[in-house]
Amino acid sequence: MTRKNNLPSEPTDALGFITRGNAYSRNGAYEQAIDSYTKAVELQDDLADAYFNRGVSYYELGEFQLAISDLSRAIDINPYDDNYYGRRSLAYIFADEPDLAQADQDRCEELRN
């Protein structure tokens, strides 16, 4: 894998696109990260991390409904990751859904204990 500006070369599989998306995200390039995560889910639609990471990128851009949608998909795939609920709770807060935010925060705490 060759690197230019700390970004991986063109990926060939879903995990490669997630890795590239993560590199974009670390650099604050959320639109490019979203594009990479989207390619990952197009190749393999059962990767909870791809939906989670794309949801986080949407969250960072203030696209809270899109974030909630992707974070919900991540939870559908893997309902046992407390981080998914914690991040969706934050998105619900900014989407002015305090009851849903509290429910997710409660679930997050349950999973951590």
Features from the language model and the residues they span:
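Alpha-helical tetratricopeptide repeat
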Residues: M1-N113
